[in-house]
A protein has these predicted regions:
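Structural microenvironment flanking redox-active thiols in thiol-disulfide oxidoreductases
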Residues: 81-120, 130-137
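A short beta-strand-turn-helix
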Residues: 47-68, 91
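Hydrophobic beta-strand anchors of alpha/beta hydrolase catalytic cores
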Residues: 69-70, 101
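Conserved redox-active cysteine motifs that mediate thiol-disulfide chemistry
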Residues: 64, 72-89
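N-terminal targeting signals for export/organelle localization
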Residues: 1-44, 171, 178
């Protein structure tokens, strides 16, 4: 009989311990959760202002009325390097049709980014997110990640990973103003 009571006590203690750990984990997880909401298709793209390689400010809301091909990338990222020349070629096709590229480099030096842009002969605006605040606001992971923003400023599509030139042309057509 004493053994049965001891077993019940042990089982109850084990259950209470598991519940306590689950509660503590839930509280900790909620307290440390990312303060930014996950963005999705149909959401308004959060506004930001970043500076390009020429020192010129680019504010996302200034592009309202145009389609924006918002690309997050790094010079060390092989898929980014592969898609950049195709993005530049499509930029030449679509820039006069109301579609703009805004390429957001993630926290690298101006020197590294300028060298990369010169190496690939890129003509579209490249801005640097030195504090990673824009990357965090958009919950960017992995690189490259591209958001297609329609002329109304809403996210139309989120593309994670490398794109082909055919994909890029199709996506730019998709956000081209009527």
């Amino acid at each position: 009989m004493a053994q049965t009571k001891q077993k019940r006590f042990l089982i109850r203690t084990l259950i209470l311990t598991v519940l306590a750990v689950a509660i503590i984990y839930t509280i900790y997880n909620n307290a440390t959760k990312d303060k930014f909401e996950v963005l999705g298709v149909g959401d308004e793209a959060p506004d930001f202002t970043l500076v390009d390689l020429n020192g010129e400010e680019h504010r996302l809301s200034d592009y309202k009325g145009q389609g924006v091909f918002l690309n997050f990338w790094g010079t060390w990222c092989k898929p980014c390097a592969k898609e950049m020349p195709a993005m530049d070629r499509q930029y030449e096709v679509f820039k006069d049709q109301g579609v703009q590229i805004l390429a957001v480099n993630i926290a690298q030096s101006n020197f590294e980014v300028e060298r990369f842009a010169d190496q690939y002969g890129l003509d579209f605006p490249i801005v640097i997110d030195k504090t990673k605040s824009v990357m965090e606001a958009y919950n960017i992971d992995p690189l490259p990640t591209t958001l297609l923003i329609n002329p109304e400023g809403e996210i139309e599509k989120i593309v994670r990973g490398e794109m082909t030139e055919q994909d890029i042309a199709l996506f730019m057509e998709q956000i081209r103003p009527e």
